[in-house]
Amino acid sequence: MHLLVHPNGSKYWRLQYRYEGKQKMLALGVYPEITLADARVRRDEARKLLANGVDPGDKKKNDKVEQSKARTFKEVAIEWHGTNKKWSEDHAHRVLKSLEDNLFAALGERNIAELKTRDLLAPIKAVEMSGRLEVAARLQQRTTAIMRYAVQSGLIDYNPAQEMAGAVASCNRQHRPALELKRIPELLTKIDSYTGRPLTRWAIELTLLIFIRSSELRFARWSEIDFEASIWTIPPEREPIPGVKHSHRGSKMRTTHLVPLSTQALAILKQIKQFYGAHDLIFIGDHDSHKPMSENTVNSALRVMGYDTKVEVCGHGFRTMACSSLVESGLWSRDAVERQMSHMARNSVRAAYIHKAEHLEERRLMLQWWADFLDVNRERFISPFEYAKINNPLKQ
């Protein structure tokens, strides 16, 4: 008995034996799921079979065939899907929908014990060839996880999906375009000169001032705004709007996100409320007041202003511009900036600390400083670092 170590680091227990004069190999399981003690028990069972004239390899194959007759790829995939208890309901739905749309037609009814690497790869390559590289990459990861689950469940001895490594083109996720900070005065001038729908201009201005995500802004309700406390509370989830996809989305991090409102942001919200306050939604659609503003509205307006939203700047790029400016100023703590960006800290202890502490008072000062910085830049460009020298609210 020995432990076979593959180049990718996976480890398998193997037993060499002779049967009817032929050298054979028996798979005893995957390490560390199968411990040394477990492997020894399986070795001893195999030796007993040999002593009785039974080939343990043949018996195992026959047992596997009987065991896996009713175990299709779809059944095992759904079983694997159900083990991921930490997924949110929304994420779990998206994962299952992706499997249904892209894998189950080709693999769903296939016996999982008979699937080869080429079988698993075929539908994934079809997705890749359609240009959906990121979807293909996720399907490869999930197929590998499903087949690993099958190994761990004793349905198969080896994970053929491991051999798909490198077969699917990697997707280099592109950062959303953002303007160089020195072009902020130009951007502000174009926003001020925008002659389209006023609500669209206010959406752009507010996005720049508080740099929340598109869905966090578009699906917002007036009930989330506390004008007295100057705070916007974005909930983890919202009441879905009938017929509007993803309208239940709140904070992307799925925790309550508090957004302090500068005097400039409050002024914009008060203007919007004056005209559209009778509706539940803050940013209503152009043609239907019961539906939210389109997700393309901000970028469409930026294109009207003359910007290439794929190269120069897009609505999401405002977040990059704000983050760069706040960091460059040297005034604000990393935790305050990260919390305001609603980023999830990788370190779980750090994440818990940041979430609990909130850094709310520092963030109030920070967003007011950012709004004032934008106002100053309407006249001429001044860098965040230089502006921090003349406006440091932490010393006042």
Curated annotation (Swiss-Prot):
Keyword check for DNA-binding: yes
PROSITE patterns: CB (PS51900), TYR_RECOMBINASE (PS51898)
Residue stretches making up the Core-binding (CB) domain: 71-151
Domain Tyr recombinase residues, every copy: 174-367
UniProt keywords, alphabetically: DNA integration, DNA recombination, DNA-binding, Viral genome integration, Virus entry into host cell
Gene3D superfamilies linked to this entry: 1.10.150.130, Integrase, DNA-binding domain (3.30.160.390), Intergrase catalytic core (1.10.443.10)
Xref: InterPro entries: CB, DNA_brk_join_enz, Integrase-like_cat_sf, Integrase_catalytic, Integrase_DNA-bd_sf, Integrase_DNA_bind_dom, Integrase_recombinase_N, Phage_int_M
Location of the active site: 213, 252, 316, 319, 343, 353 (o-(3'-phospho-dna)-tyrosine intermediate)
BP term (GO), one: DNA recombination
Superkingdom of the organism of origin: Bacteria
GO molecular function: DNA binding; prophage integrase activity
Family matches, as Pfam families: Arm-DNA-bind_3, Phage_int_M, Phage_integrase
Entry GO CC: cytosol
Protein family (similarity comment): Belongs to the 'phage' integrase family.
UniProt-recorded name of the protein: Putative protein IntB
Organism: Escherichia coli (strain K12)
